[in-house]
């Protein structure tokens, strides 16, 4: 996915998990309850990074599931997702 770059855990909740490359050029947003995952690269990763930082600034007290759920549902990132392999 990221040409050998490690992906580290950035945010983790009961419903959602977010991983990112060190340079934030790639993100993996996962819905744990729905078993879907969105791989975001290039321009999609840049847009997601800006949206994620904006949600964090606007709602600093939100827990990971609130922030990531907002991006998943209302940010439209669920449309980038595919069902996880079994």
Per-region residue spans from a language model:
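Mixed-charge, Lys/Arg-enriched low-complexity segments
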Residues: 41-86
